[in-house]
Amino acid sequence: MIPGEFLIEDGEIELNAGRATVTLSVANAGDRPIQVGSHYHFFETNPALKFDRKKARGMRLDIAAGTAVRFEPGQTREVQLVALAGKRVVYGFRGDVMGKLDKA
């Protein structure tokens, strides 16, 4: 093995299998590009992104960890979101939730 070498098996890797998803149309109504990372709570993204925020609550982009989606000014694109897993508690971001996503 060479240092830093990856040994990848043949086949497909399925991301987020069995998790709830939703597809939304998202438009950047701002005058600057907006980039959203893979694990950002999509509900709390920049207000210049226009989409159905209620459907995005408790969701993140359904993309590989460490990647992002960029929205250029005036651009509209479809994105698939996936439900956050784990304890489903959200703190930080824009401070819109600051606690449990699900009602007790």
Curated annotation (Swiss-Prot):
GO cellular component, one term: urease complex
One Pfam family matching this protein: Urease_beta
Main localization of the protein described in the UniProt heading: cytoplasm
Tagged with keyword Hydrolase: yes
PANTHER family: UREASE
Subunit-structure text: Heterotrimer of UreA (gamma), UreB (beta) and UreC (alpha) subunits. Three heterotrimers associate to form the active enzyme.
Recorded family membership: Belongs to the urease beta subunit family.
The name this protein goes by in its record: Urease subunit beta
Gene: ureB
